[in-house]
Structures are given as structure tokens and as C-alpha cells.
A protein has these predicted regions:
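Conserved active-site neighborhood of the chymotrypsin/trypsin-like protease fold
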Residues: 1-77, 99, 108, 180, ...
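Terminal peptide-recognition signature
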Residues: 4, 27, 41, 63-68, ...
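C-terminal cap/linker of serine protease catalytic domains
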Residues: 27, 49, 68, 75, ...
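PDZ-domain C-terminal substructure recognizer with occasional recognition of PDZ-binding tails
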Residues: 28, 155-162, 183, 190, ...
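PDZ/PDZ-like domain segments forming the peptide/carboxylate-binding groove
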Residues: 104-108, 112-113, 171-206, 210-213
């Protein structure tokens, strides 16, 4: 069983797993969780490599020494330091309460293993971003999804291919913080928001009657509207006009190819 970051395998038509020892075996997408970003791949052949233990009991904090290891063996492993544990809001309707940020940034971060001092797996590499603690210039870091988010959903991923809970409402809306405002940065062609008249550049003021001052607050208010299928009402400013936009949300997973071997 291989744990990776989901965007590498979502809607994949074929998967091959290779090791630094050589050889390759086919793989199958076993599960993908939209909320954490974790993806599971089942090897359809024997992998001649040892498994790594999950470090779910380790407290990971700023200053911890870690290793970020990508494919390719030791030559693609980078000694790093945890520079922060903090909230991360992504423009694509994504939010982590306590993401792990490490530096220096690994050039091959996607799906890389974050390994703690005891040799256990403490996270999976997701992004290359810029980070500032407010006292220094912004620097390149990797954002890592913490491993402790996996155990609560692992059985569901193995059984159903996704967490067995009501899915969050998905709008198909890309948003960003610009000068203390939440701005529509783009719209997914297949998403429900693209059919409502929203345009890039529109400023989002509130979800229903609840003002939103940050991207994280915006996503939380959207998800508080109910499960997928719920209507999400936005107050939006365009030029000098304010208007309400009603978006019939959907389940994002329905828009994607799903695992078929369950």
C-alpha cells in the first residue's frame, strides 16, 4: 500500500510504481480524500521494499529536524527543518488547520515522505509555497500534509475509496486574498459557480449574512452551509454594486473518475 498526495493520481488512467532498486509494478488508485489531499495506491504486484511506520504519536513542531525524501533514494532526500505548524488555505476550496511547513524547499516535493528523527513517516509533501513568520523576508518552503490526518479516514479509504461521511459542498470557485479582500480568481468550467454569473475579480463580502475576512474563514462558512447539494449564498461586490449570488453546490467527487476495484 502506497500513500501519496492525491493530485498525482486523481483520474489517472494508469499507474506504475518503481523503486530505487529497479523494476516496476502496476498500481491501482484505492482511495482519495478531497479534504486532506491524501491518496492511496494499491500495488498490483510485489514491492521489494520495506514499509515505513506512521509517526502518529510524534508531536511535530517548529525547529524539529526532519528529512524530506522524494523518489530516487538517498540522493533525492533533503535534510530540512520544520519552520511552522499553522493554518493553510488553498485557493481551490482546501484548508488544513495545522499544516507542516519545512525549509529548505525540496525541488521534487509532490508525494515526498516527511520523515521524523525516529525514522517514522510524519507527513506527505504537497506544495512549494512562500512563507513568512512576519519578522523576515518570505522564503521558499514546502507545505506538508500531517500524517495524523490519515488514521481517522484510513479504513474508509480502504473500504469505500473515500471517507464515509457527507461530502462538503463544492462550488468550482478559485479564490484568493488580495489587499484584505477575498477575490474570485477563477472558475472551474465544470463547477456550478461558473453558471451563476460570477466573474474573476468579483469581491466576496459574505456567505449569507456572515462577513468573511480571510480565505480560511470563507471556506469554513461555505462548508457550514450544509453538505454537498446545499445552496451557498454569497454577497458579492462588482465595481460599485453589491449583489447576491446563489450557487447550487455539488459533490466534487462526482466530477472525477472514481476507483473501480472496491
Amino acid at each position: 500500500l502506497v500513500l501519496t498526495i492525491g493530485y498525482l493520481i486523481s483520474e489517472a488512467e494508469s499507474i506504475w510504481l518503481t523503486s530505487s532498486l529497479g523494476g516496476a509494478v502496476p498500481g491501482h488508485v484505492l482511495g482519495y480524500d478531497q479534504e486532506t489531499g491524501f491518496g492511496l495506491v494499491q500495488a498490483l504486484g510485489r514491492l521489494s521494499v520495506p514499509a515505513i511506520e506512521m509517526g502518529t504519536r510524534i508531536r511535530v513542531g517548529a525547529g524539529d529536524k526532519v528529512i524530506l525524501a522524494a523518489e530516487g533514494g538517498r540522493r533525492h532526500a533533503v535534510a530540512a527543518t520544520v519552520v511552522a505548524r499553522q493554518e493553510f488555505a488553498g485557493y481551490w476550496e482546501y484548508l488544513l488547520d495545522r499544516a507542516i511547513f519545512t525549509a529548505p524547499a525540496h525541488p521534487f516535493w509532490g508525494g515526498a515522505a516527511l520523515i521524523g528523527g525516529d525514522g517514522s513517516l510524519i507527513g506527505i509533501g504537497s506544495l512549494h509555497v512562500q512563507h513568512s513568520n512576519g519578522r523576515e523576508l518570505r522564503r521558499d518552503v514546502n507545505m506538508v500534509v500531517p500524517i495524523d490526518l490519515l488514521p481517522p479516514i484510513l479504513d474508509d479509504l480502504l473500504t469505500y475509496g473515500r471517507p464515509n461521511r457527507p461530502p462538503r459542498p463544492w462550488l468550482g470557485l478559485y479564490a484568493a486574498e488580495v489587499e484584505d479582500a477575498i477575490v474570485v480568481a477563477g472558475l472551474s468550467d465544470r463547477g456550478p459557480a461558473s453558471k451563476t454569473g460570477l466573474k474573476p475579480g468579483d469581491r466576496i463580502l459574505a456567505v449569507r449574512d456572515e462577513p468573511v475576512a480571510s480565505l480560511a474563514a470563507f471556506w469554513r462558512r461555505v462548508w457550514a452551509s450544509g453538505p454537498a447539494g446545499s445552496e451557498v449564498v454569497l454577497q458579492v461586490a462588482r465595481d460599485k454594486e453589491t449583489m447576491k449570488v446563489r450557487i447550487p453546490s455539488t459533490d466534487r467527487t462526482r466530477m472525477m473518475k472514481a476507483p473501480r476495484l472496491h
